[in-house]
Amino acid sequence: MTTLGTPVSLGRRTRTGRLELEFGVRHGQTALLRDLQKAPLMVVRPFRLPCGTLMVFIVNPTGGVLGGDHSEIHVEAGAGTRVLILTQSATRVQPSPGGEWATQELHFHVGVGARLEYYPERTLPFAGSRFRQHLRADLGAGAEFGLLETLASGRVQMGERLAWADYRSEVSVYAAQERVYLDRQHFRPGPHSRAPGVLGGNDYFASGVWVAGDSAAGRPAAESPTTAPGWASGLSAGGAVWARGVAATGPALDHAARQLREQVRHDLFGAAPLVLRR
């Protein structure tokens, strides 16, 4: 028991959130069959989009993640399902005066012929914060997967840029138990972060990957989905379409990212544009 005057160790985790979601097909439609929610992670009622995809929002009602916080998200998209997962707001990574890491683990399993897409809101690391994320997606035969994440250099409107202590992210995608994509990012701001050829004058960054299962019909078109300045895209050795971009402002990045996302989804998945309600 902690009493007044008893110091609380800054090194221990302050919160551990867990979210488990299982989707399946019921009466010919994708449905959320099971959910386990441990605060501060939770979901709101699913929405069905006009295209038939089931959309779910992940919510963290707190003011952000703190050093020592840990969250785990596990999603099972059963055979033939169509699932879209979004987050309600930006992930605000609070300062960590004691040097503790805020960590997040995500594991997606996409069943035979299913499609799972994850497009979270922006990650916003505050000055002095430390954030580490690991995301893994395992795809069954003919499964499709899409991911697009964005990162800000800090609280730009307050004049705070590249002041965080450390940011690390690893994304891996496996199809038929073979790794088709691996992306490791490690940002530790330093005196040369703003140098030409590194970040230049840009404050917003994006990275994405899309995998189309067994079908390669749309890959040539999807390999170069955008000609927007500050963006690059290509095809991994395993057949995954990847993209990465930078922009000076958030709206500019988001506009280009939406265009790219819909172009890749059309070319690779043959999917209709997403009509999102927030």
UniProtKB/Swiss-Prot annotation:
GO terms for CC? cytoplasm
Q: Which GO terms describe its molecular function?
A: nickel cation binding
Q: What is its main location?
A: cytoplasm
Q: Subcellular localization, per the record? A: Cytoplasm
Has keyword Chaperone? yes
Write down the Pfam families for this protein, in alphabetical order: UreD (PF01774)
Keyword terms, alphabetized: Chaperone, Cytoplasm, Nickel insertion
Assembly and interaction partners? UreD, UreF and UreG form a complex that acts as a GTP-hydrolysis-dependent molecular chaperone, activating the urease apoprotein by helping to assemble the nickel containing metallocenter of UreC. The UreE protein probably delivers the nickel.
Sorted alphabetically, which PANTHER family does this protein's record hold? Answer: UREASE ACCESSORY PROTEIN D
What the protein does? Answer: Required for maturation of urease via the functional incorporation of the urease nickel metallocenter.
Family statement drawn from the similarity comment of this UniProt entry = Belongs to the UreD family.
Q: What's this protein's name?
A: Urease accessory protein UreD
Upper lineage: Bacteria, Thermotogati, Deinococcota, Deinococci, Deinococcales
